[in-house]
Amino acid sequence: NKQPDFLVTFESNEKLQKGISEIESEYPYRKFCPLENLYGMHLYSKLPFEEVSLRFLIEEDVPSMKVKINHHGQDVTLYFLHPKPPSPTENTYAKPRDVELNVVGEEIAETEGPIVVAGDLNDVAWSPTTRKFKKISGLLDPREGRGFFNTFHAKYPLVKWPLDHVFHSEHFALVNIEKLESIGSDHYPLYTELALITDKE
């Protein structure tokens, strides 16, 4: 039974929002963007927001969130992303996804302090796009040396890919990362526990 400080849902709409409304008592700080196009996003937090912004960086129907909190006296910046994948039913090419990751990566490179990025990037960790994002942003992948943590597809036992990601700056140490049991989605939940190193400059 996990009790994360932040819980983020992707592909979420008003129906899901109502269906899990009982958790709102545990998460007093929230930002919702329910959509019916599979790109809705809901953020639940136990920690207060200093700033929270809903952004449409590349496509007008694909949101992302940028959040700032203060934790143990340090300003922490959080990004939550879910760009469209290249597919016959979505984008026929990868450019919007790649551009969004480049934009966020370049923004992170100019941002000081602790940073975490989490989301369904619709891309695997070893792809040129994801590797470029890590290089531009300078962020770390907590899965390296620990496994793939294949979160998609939860309903096909022989076809699984690590499409859900968490990246963090060197201001954090990994405590735990694990793929949780299926909750009925086509993605498994990915639980990541990070410890902020409070004396990191």
Where are these regions (language model features)?
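Soluble catalytic domains of enzymes that build or remodel membrane lipids, polysaccharides, and related
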Residues: 1-201
